[in-house]
Swiss-Prot record:
Gene it is expressed from: lacC
Superkingdom, natural source: Bacteria
UniProt keyword Ion transport, yes or no: no
Pathway recorded for this protein: Carbohydrate metabolism; D-tagatose 6-phosphate degradation; D-glyceraldehyde 3-phosphate and glycerone phosphate from D-tagatose 6-phosphate: step 1/2
One CC-aspect GO term: cytosol
Swiss-Prot/TrEMBL catalytic activity: D-tagatofuranose 6-phosphate + ATP = D-tagatofuranose 1,6-bisphosphate + ADP + H(+)
Protein name, UniProt field: Tagatose-6-phosphate kinase
Biological process according to GO: D-tagatose 6-phosphate catabolic process; lactose catabolic process via tagatose-6-phosphate
Gene3D superfamilies in UniProt: 3.40.1190.20
Amino acid sequence: MILTVTLNPAIDVSYPLNELKCDTVNRVVDVTKTPGGKGLNVSRVLNDFGETVKATGCIGGESGDFIINHLPDSILSRFYKISGDTRTCIAILHEGNQTEILEKGPLLSVDEIDGFTHHFKYLLNDVDVVTLSGSLPAGMPDDYYQKLIKIANLNGKKTVLDCSGNALEAVLKGDSKPTVIKPNLEELSQLLGKEMTKDFEALKEVLQDELFEGIEWIIVSLGADGVFAKHKDTFYNVDIPKIKIVSAVGSGDSTVAGIASGLANDEDDRALLTKANVLGMLNAQEKTTGHVNMANYDKLYQSIKIKEV
């Protein structure tokens, strides 16, 4: 079983408009509301793929109830209730553009943070892999993911971390390391303080930096150009075919789902990397975020090319 953690989930609201007019009324006819957050996207893709998954995180208020009520029944909801209201994130789609208005989310108390920590320990009993995705809610310290990873490691669970900024830096500088991290080139550049490109030799050099010591898998997203990955002392380039992209939103989360599934099933390097990339591409072919059409899985699977570099 795979446990997905979304500490700062949201209701994602989409407002499609022909034209966005400022300082006046804009009326929306076709409103879409879905449970949002990177970890929930991971949950839905794992569910589509047929994995057993349970989802946790911190939710509160009517917005939190909405998230529980609108997840597929086959996803085991194990959320921790807090006093604050779960945030709403609005995307206004207009004239080929997307304008986003993102709430910060609730402020968690010390007692609520401690409560979730105990809740997390309890949820580990029957899982093999834990995914940790997205931003931390207000009130949580930057090193909170480090704390969860330490607990998971002590319980013999594999962890996949997909975050950025201070939260990622705190983990890399900490004593407990995740099994997998999945930065993109921009996030890698931010970590290292220098611009990184798709130069494989340069990537090989930086991924051996002591900053990443102790992390079994480092999977660097290259967008439409695939992936550059390091597993222990072996490096891989994953070449993916060109596809028609409907929406790339959530494709990174779908890739995380594939990584988690590969770890849970003890797959070899090539199988894990292939599955992860196929699920990312399948999501990009869909309008709905965090959804994959498995009818196209086998064809894309055969088109992935992996070589050691």
